[in-house]
Amino acid sequence: MAQKRKNDKIETSKKEEIDPRFVNKFEDLEENDFKDDDEDDFINDVNEGEEEEEEEDNEDNIEFNQEEDDEDEDDEENKDNKNKIKKVIKIKPMDIEKMKKLKEQNENKGIIYLSTIPSRMKPAKLKQLLAKYGKVTRMHLVRANVERKNHRNDMFKEGWIEFEDKALARKIATILNNIPMGGKARDIHKDCLWNLRYLPKFKWHHLQDKLVSQRMERDKKLRLEINQVRKQNLILLEQVELSKHVNQKHESKGKPIKEKVVRTFKQRSSHEDSLNSNISSKVLEKVVSNKKQKIN
């Protein structure tokens, strides 16, 4: 029944669309022809609708997969960030035995003072030269020009070198002092002399204390200078505010504001100018005429 109603509706719609002049010609056609065409159109419409739905489903699946991939990437980034976070290292207190061992090791170590370091000699090369004679544990070198940039600052003026054995450090200082460094023929520092001195009863913590005290003094000087500059700035600001306040008072009372006094002084004439002015014009003419005669 439903199909018959659909067919009747299709026929009536087609009749309404057809021009009345051609109605008789279309009435002669069989009803089956219209039925077949309508069925084919209906099937094609259904198939097209199914294809569109499948395409939409595929697009939804692709979008969903992309969202899942983005979420997975975000999770991986978060994991990487968590792994990058520095772990807090808890420092455990040392045992008494370890403390004793460290004290013994530090007591056995010896330090040599190097008063002059050749130009263009880097710490790695210096350590390589001294490591031939004994094991070097620590080094501290002072730059010659602190204000110079780091990538151009290759000059050191003095240094402290710590050896593992103090007896060996004493021997190295006595033997190598005022002796050429040696090396290959093309080496720049081949003919440079060692300037070494062994420091008895001098340990690495003494050097650290000295450096810390120097740093503290430098920081104190900087703070004092900064405080002085701040005080000067505050005084200037107070003076400016006072001048503004005074000007506002004068304006409210109707008094004229005093202009700043600019003092100018006449410059005295010099002794040479006075002598030149005293010379008469006749004398000048004679001098000029004599010069012209000599030239001719």
Curated annotation (Swiss-Prot):
Q: Which PANTHER family match?
A: ACTIVATOR OF BASAL TRANSCRIPTION 1
A GO BP term here is: endonucleolytic cleavage in ITS1 to separate SSU-rRNA from 5.8S rRNA and LSU-rRNA from tricistronic rRNA transcript (SSU-rRNA, 5.8S rRNA, LSU-rRNA)
In UniProt terms, what function does this protein have? May be involved in the small subunit (SSU) processome assembly and function, and in the 17S rRNA synthesis.
Q: How does it assemble?
A: Component of the 90S pre-ribosomes.
What sequence ranges are listed for the domain RRM? 110-193
Keyword Nucleus in record: yes
The source's superkingdom equals Eukaryota
Q: What is this protein called?
A: Putative pre-rRNA-processing protein esf2
Task: Give the chief site where it resides.
Answer: nucleus
Q: Which InterPro entries match?
A: ABT1/Esf2 (IPR039119), ABT1/ESF2_RRM (IPR034353), Nucleotide-bd_a/b_plait_sf (IPR012677), RBD_domain_sf (IPR035979), RRM_dom (IPR000504)
Q: Where is this region: Disordered?
A: 1-84
Q: Which GO terms describe its cellular component?
A: nucleolus
Which residue windows does the record flag with biased composition (Basic and acidic residues)?
Answer: 8-27
Which keywords has UniProt assigned to this entry? Nucleus, Ribosome biogenesis, RNA-binding, rRNA processing
- GO molecular function (one): RNA binding
Give a Pfam family name.
Answer: RRM_1
Residue stretches of biased makeup (Acidic residues): 28-78
Q: Where in the cell is it found?
A: Nucleus, Nucleolus
Member of which family? Belongs to the ESF2/ABP1 family.
Q: What gene does the UniProt entry assign to this protein? A: esf2
